[in-house]
Curated annotation (Swiss-Prot):
Source species, domain of life: Eukaryota
UniProt feature coiled coil, ranges: none
Record's GO cellular component terms: chloroplast thylakoid membrane; photosystem I
Upper classification of the organism: Eukaryota, Viridiplantae, Chlorophyta, Ulvophyceae, OUU clade
Name the record gives this protein: Photosystem I P700 chlorophyll a apoprotein A1
Amino acid sequence: MTISPPEREAKKVKIVVDRDPVETSFEKWAKPGHFSRTLSKGPTTTTWIWNLHADAHDFDAQTTDLEEISRKVFSAHFGQLGIIFIWLSGMYFHGARFSNYEAWLSDPTHIKPSAQVVWPIVGQEILNGDVGGGFQGIQITSGFFQLWRASGITTELQLYSTAIGGLVMAAAMFFAGWFHFHKSAPKLEWFQNVESMLNHHLSGLLGLGSLAWAGHQIHVSLPINKLLDAGVDPHEIPLPHELILNPSLMAQLYPSFKQGLAPFFTLNWSEYSDFLTFQGGLNPVTGGLWLTDTAHHHLAIAVLFIVAGHMYRTNWGIGHSMKEILDAHKGPFTGEGHKGLYEILTTSWHAQLAINLALFGSLSIIVAHHQYSMPPYPYLATDYATQLSLFTHHNWIGGFCIVGAAAHAAIFMIRDYDPTNNYNNLLDRVIRHRDAIISHLNWVCIFLGFHSFGLYIHNDTMSALGRPADMFSDTAIQLQPVFAQWIQKTHFLAPGFTAPNALASTSPSWGGDVVAVGGKVAMMPISLGTSDFLVHHVHAFTIHVTVLILLKGVLYARSSRLIPDKANLGFRFPCDGPGRGGTCQVSAWDHVFLGLFWMYNAISVVIFHFSWKMQSDVWGTVNASGISHITGGNFAQSANTINGWLRDFLWAQSSQVIQSYGSSLSAYGLIFLGAHFVWAFSLMFLFSGRGYWQELIESIVWAHNKLKVAPAIQPRALSITQGRAVGVAHYLLGGIATTWSFFLARIIAVG
């Protein structure tokens, strides 16, 4: 930490906003493309509408003034938050108006969650399945019911109130977006004041946010959930305001409330251990994490982040300076180290966004893996359809964010990177030895690809030849994942040494006893074997190839041996001009395009592995004779051949979606069919040449001219880049919707 010289102390509070910078007017709304000289002239060819969509939000292309760009982005964020609040409000409104939440609350193990009722217009009411408790509706798999129970919501009135609150917040956000662009817009120096931003985001957003949630959990969620777990009728449970205002009510449930704040100020904190616990594992009644553990966790997180938000130097001459930290960060082999990175991160929002997307995407994938192993909400673990949906959803989101990180890193390299300010720092050194990085990464991909695929091919061949003893499997040649098993064992044993008062390890997946709720497995030890070893190497392969493509796109965004002046051609271009063959599809955009396909591959293998593994080895029913898993443990025997994946996973488990017609799951059958069609439609764009379509269009235009109905706007074939964009969008949409309908029809039918 450094202390500032006294002359910096005298800094007075500065005005960091401009008043009324942009007048509010709807004139521009009537003029599509007002932000571009070319587009505002209106359409002459059909390419205009594509360029309009491509450039509407490309603020860099509309102005070079960083302050104006920053204000537009800042204002757009408020608009985004407004839309999120409207969406959330809609979810809560559906819970209040169209759901069986109160019935589900009374019997969450037998009644399924539903918050949508289909109106009978032409027979769609077949979709309203019987979810139990005398309610007909569509089974939802978003996890909102479990979240609401964990929050302590017991009545539909509370859901209505929260829905209205969401709309009020949305209005506030839309107002803020308008106000901070038109009335009081921050100056560039406000956006670049990173120390203030860190302090406010760490202390305010994360610190006080966690503290507020911990307070809600302690005063509202814990008492209500304790009573619900004990079987008290939701209608007889005191309302939140009664619990907050009446300490004697709380003291009946948590005796330490009698003592008030005395133990806190006398540092006798262990008195509060009746509602701030460190038990570990899952609550056997609900199959979720102990809510007293999660309240304790949020309180601890709040303390950490409130402290963290006091670390950076602002108007008082104490604390860290981000620039000083980065400039001082040098190692013996890293040249100038982090010098120059501060300037990059305060002048390039693409660089900032790239880092945030990479972190946020990784975090989303981490959430996916924790929400099944450590289910945070009551009765989440036994709702298999919701578990599968949340896992799948958070993986897809993470994959898209990580590809987006590479996209914006490449845009930064092209639009914002200045080689003169980055001599011999880490970024420059990485770019200078990019050939070594990419060629080594390429070797790793080849190694992983041939070896992982080769193990499967070997097994398929031996299986076809009737030689099971020569296969890699748990019953023949074993390839046990010994490191993963060691990690499981150490995590199972660790709490005994590091947290002797904890009742269990962090998750039953490490080892120990089965946690069953209402005769269903919530979580249990997950045994790993040869089949997991094989598919984990496919995970490694697909992830490394995705990284290879994306990283190559970033490192070669400005120049390459093939096209030394690539930076001048921009982020997306079809080829390096006429007369230079073999230079097509090399733009940074094309790397993002290819990266999306490999991201789709990678995530697909992950969610397929999860879906089959859980059905085979975890999910199922518990009775006196033991555990009966949904697919009876067939993962270990079948998942070690490609044929096994095709026959015993894809084919065997698609019968529910294929045979869903005439049942309440029939929508999934239609989506399955339609999404296959959307996916196939994408191939028409991906496998075709632009000239083919231009020829066809000209012949059709000729026919229109003959009939004197020629259009005023001249039709044009999609450009190569546009065609590829339309192709990849439909490929991903079709693929994801196919997987979604396949998973849900299956798991709702058998789960």
